[in-house]
From Swiss-Prot:
This is Cytochrome b6-f complex subunit 4. Pfam families: Cytochrom_B_C. It comes from Pinus koraiensis. SUPFAM superfamilies: a domain/subunit of cytochrome bc1 complex (Ubiquinol-cytochrome c reductase) (SSF81648). Belongs to the cytochrome b family. PetD subfamily. The lineage of its organism: Eukaryota, Viridiplantae, Streptophyta, Embryophyta, Tracheophyta. CDD domains: cytochrome_b_C (cd00290). Component of the cytochrome b6-f complex, which mediates electron transfer between photosystem II (PSII) and photosystem I (PSI), cyclic electron flow around PSI, and state transitions.
Length: 189
């Protein structure tokens, strides 16, 4: 790590260069307000114009038209909600008599971000350690990604095949995702 040398403002050569215009605006006019006050509105208005133009010239359907007489067997959410939908779908309705219906699924969904927030505190990171080499955080993120992909793919399948992804037959169709989340979150604590 080198030491930065500050310029000597009493130096006559440097003062001559500064007098000729070599300084903070040596490369031309300053970006603010001359350049940015012109470029920002042009870019923003151009983006809005392109979006409106594409919407007018090539309108796309928002979704299928509603038909109350042809309801699908299973209504699926958008693709990015598939893991959450799979958690709600596979958790049994009542495990204990005291827990109301689907409250356990909602608690499991809330445990995902809560468990993710605890990951930085699980690791005893030395201040001189490379922050990109965190084995616990890397392992948790890889396992979490695999579980999210597994839940997402399973949500698109029928309930009979959703837990095994149709790869093998299982007698335990109502296999609970609770075990997966217990393994995922509580094995590192």
């Amino acid at each position: 790590m080198g030491v930065t040398k500050k310029p000597d403002l009493n130096d006559p050569v440097l003062r001559a260069k500064l007098a000729k215009g070599m300084g903070h605006n040596y490369y031309g006019e300053p970006a603010w307000p001359n350049d940015l006050s012109y470029i920002f509105p042009v870019v923003i208005l151009g983006t809005i114009a392109c979006t409106i133009g594409l919407a007018v010239l090539e309108p796309s359907m928002i979704g299928e038209p509603a038909n109350p007489f042809a309801t699908p067997l299973e209504i699926l959410p958008e693709w990015y909600l598939f893991p959450v939908f799979q958690i709600l779908r596979t958790v049994p309705n009542q495990i204990l008599r005291t827990v109301p219906n689907k409250l356990l699924g909602v608690l499991l969904m809330a445990s995902v971000p809560a468990g993710s927030l605890t990951v930085p505190f699980l690791e005893n990171v030395n201040q001189f350690q490379n922050p990109f080499r965190r084995p616990v955080a890397t392992t948790v993120s890889l396992i979490g990604t695999a579980v999210a992909l597994w839940l997402g793919i399973g949500a698109a399948l029928p309930i009979d095949e959703s837990l095994t992804l149709g790869l093998f037959q299982s007698n335990l169709i109502q296999l609970s995702n609770i075990k997966i989340f217990q393994i995922f979150f509580f094995s590192y604590i």
